[in-house]
Amino acid sequence: MHSWVQRLLTTATTAALLLLAACCAASALDAFHVPSVQAQAHVTKINRFHKQLNGNDKVFVFLTAEYENSKNSLNQVSLWDHIIPDKDKANLQVEVKSKYPLIDQGSSLRGKKVQLVLHWHVMPKAGVMIRDRMALSEFNLPDSYTS
C-alpha cells in the first residue's frame, strides 16, 4: 500500500508532465501561426497599426531610423516604442514627436538617406517569439544644420 505522500508526489509529477506536454504543443503550433500586421508611416507619423492577438501574447512595437555610413552598413536609432498588452488596445493611431531624439553626435548624419522601419516582436507567454519588420518611408537629412 502506498502512503499519502507517494500518492501526492505521483499526482504532482503527472500534472507537471501534462503541463509540459501542453506547453510543447503550444510552442509547436506557433510555427503555423503568422500574425497579420498592417501599418503605414510618414517620417514621424504612424497612421495605422493593427495586430490580431489571440490572448496569449503581447506585442512590442518600435520605430527605427536606419542609415548607412563608412563604418557600419546598418545603423539603427530607435525613435518610438510601445507595448500592446491585449487585443483591445491593438489598433494604434498616434501622432507624437519622437520619444527618443535622433542626435547627430559626429556630423555623420548630414545629407544621409534615412529610412523609417516599423518593427514588432510578438511575445507569447509560451511559445516562439515572432519578429518582423516593415519599411515605411525614407527621407534625406539636410546637408547643414541650423544652430
Swiss-Prot record:
The keyword Transmembrane helix applies. It is found in: Endoplasmic reticulum membrane. Belongs to the SPCS3 family. Component of the signal peptidase complex (SPC) composed of a catalytic subunit SEC11 and three accessory subunits SPCS1, SPCS2 and SPCS3. The complex induces a local thinning of the ER membrane which is used to measure the length of the signal peptide (SP) h-region of protein substrates. This ensures the selectivity of the complex towards h-regions shorter than 18-20 amino acids. One of its GO terms (biological process) is protein targeting to ER. Keywords: Endoplasmic reticulum, Membrane, Signal-anchor, Transmembrane, Transmembrane helix. This is Signal peptidase complex subunit 3. GO terms for cellular component: signal peptidase complex. The keyword Membrane applies. Its main location: endoplasmic reticulum. InterPro entries: SPC3 (IPR007653). It holds the Pfam family SPC22. Essential component of the signal peptidase complex (SPC) which catalyzes the cleavage of N-terminal signal sequences from nascent proteins as they are translocated into the lumen of the endoplasmic reticulum. Essential for the SPC catalytic activity, possibly by stabilizing and positioning the active center of the complex close to the lumenal surface. It is a single-pass type II membrane protein. Residues 30-147 are lumenal. Residues 1-6 are cytoplasmic. The chain crosses the membrane at residues 7-29.
